[in-house]
Regions:
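Flexible loop residues that form catalytic
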Residues: 42, 155, 206
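Conserved catalytic scaffold of divalent metal-dependent phosphoesterases
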Residues: 45, 72-177
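Soluble or luminal CAZymes and related metallo-dependent hydrolases
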Residues: 18, 22, 52-59, 130-143, ...
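Binuclear metal-dependent phosphoesterase catalytic core
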Residues: 104-107, 191-195, 207-232
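Active-site-proximal beta-strand elements of phosphoester/diester hydrolases
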Residues: 7-17, 108-117, 148-153, 218-223
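Core catalytic region of metal-dependent phosphoesterases/phosphodiesterases
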Residues: 3-9, 13, 18-106
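A short helix->loop->beta-strand "cap" motif at the edges of active sites that frequently abuts
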Residues: 66-71, 196-199, 217
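Proline-aspartate-enriched helix->loop->beta-strand connector
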Residues: 147, 151-152, 169, 189-203
C-alpha cells in the first residue's frame, strides 16, 4: 500500500478531457502547489499515438514538478485502460496513473480508487482511437476493502443523476444494450459500497456538480475542471 506524504494536502479535480492548459490555468489561479492533485477520471490519456502520448506525459510531469504538484488519475471512460495497469502504467515523479482497486493511505485514512464507466456515445467512436472496449467498471470483489474515502468515475444509483436524460435516450436508439449496461454498472457500484462503506465519496463522469449525504456517506460529484479539497 502506498503511503502519501501527510504534509501534502490532497486536491481532487473533475473530468478535464486532456485540456491541460485549462487545468494549469485553474491551479495557477487558485495558487495550488505542494500537494497531490487527483483526477476522478477522463484525463484524456490515450487519444494520441503512443509515442506522442508518452512525450506529452513527460512534459506534463516536468510542468507539475515545477508547480510542486504530484498529479494522479484514475481512469475514466475517456482514457485508454492500458495506461492504467501492467507494464504500461505511468509512474513518474509527478505524474501517475492509478490502477483500479489501488488503496493508499493519507494522514491515517484509507482511500480506494476504482475507475471506469460506459460511454453513452460509444456507437459513434472508433475502437482503439477514441473508445476502448475495456472502458467500463470492472468488478473485483476480492480487492475491495473497508476504507474512509472512495474515489470512482461513475456512481451508485442513489447518487445524482438518478435518471437518464434525453441525451442518453437519444444515443440508446443506436445502441441496443446501452441502457441495460448503464443500469447494471451503477447497481454494481452499489455492491461496491456495501463492502467499502466510505464516509466520503468523490466521482465525476456526469459533468455536473452535486453533493449530498446519503446513509452516512458524503457524496460529491465534481464538474468539469472543478477542484475540491476536504480542507477548504
Amino acid at each position: 500500500m502506498k503511503i502519501l506524504d501527510k504534509n501534502k494536502p490532497i486536491f481532487y479535480v473533475g473530468d478535464h478531457h486532456g485540456n491541460w492548459g485549462q487545468l494549469f490555468w485553474f491551479t495557477d489561479r487558485l495558487k495550488i502547489e505542494n500537494c497531490y492533485l487527483i483526477s476522478v477520471g477522463d484525463s484524456g490519456i490515450g487519444f494520441k499515438p503512443q509515442k506522442e502520448q508518452l512525450i506529452d506525459i513527460k512534459q506534463l510531469n516536468k510542468k507539475f514538478k515545477k508547480h510542486d504538484i504530484i498529479f494522479m488519475s484514475i481512469r475514466g471512460n475517456h482514457d485508454d485502460p492500458s495506461y492504467y495497469n501492467g507494464t504500461d502504467r505511468i509512474e513518474l515523479s509527478n505524474f501517475e496513473t492509478i490502477e483500479d482497486y489501488t488503496v493508499m493511505e493519507h494522514n491515517g485514512k484509507l482511500i480506494q480508487f476504482i475507475g471506469g464507466a460506459t460511454s453513452i456515445d460509444r456507437s459513434m467512436r472508433k475502437e482503439g482511437v477514441s473508445y476502448w472496449s475495456g472502458e467500463g467498471l470492472n468488478f473485483n470483489g476480492d480487492k475491495l476493502q473497508k476504507v474512509d474515502t472512495l474515489i470512482t468515475h461513475t456512481a451508485p444509483t442513489w447518487c445524482f443523476p438518478q435518471r437518464f436524460n434525453k441525451m442518453v435516450y437519444d444515443w440508446a436508439k443506436d445502441d441496443g444494450y446501452l441502457l441495460e449496461e448503464l443500469t447494471l454498472e451503477r447497481e454494481v457500484m452499489g455492491e461496491i459500497f456495501k463492502v467499502c462503506q466510505p464516509s466520503l465519496h468523490l466521482y465525476g463522469h456526469f459533468h455536473d456538480s452535486w453533493n449530498e449525504e446519503v446513509n452516512g456517506c458524503k457524496h460529491r460529484l465534481l464538474n468539469i475542471n472543478e477542484i475540491w479539497t476536504a480542507f477548504e
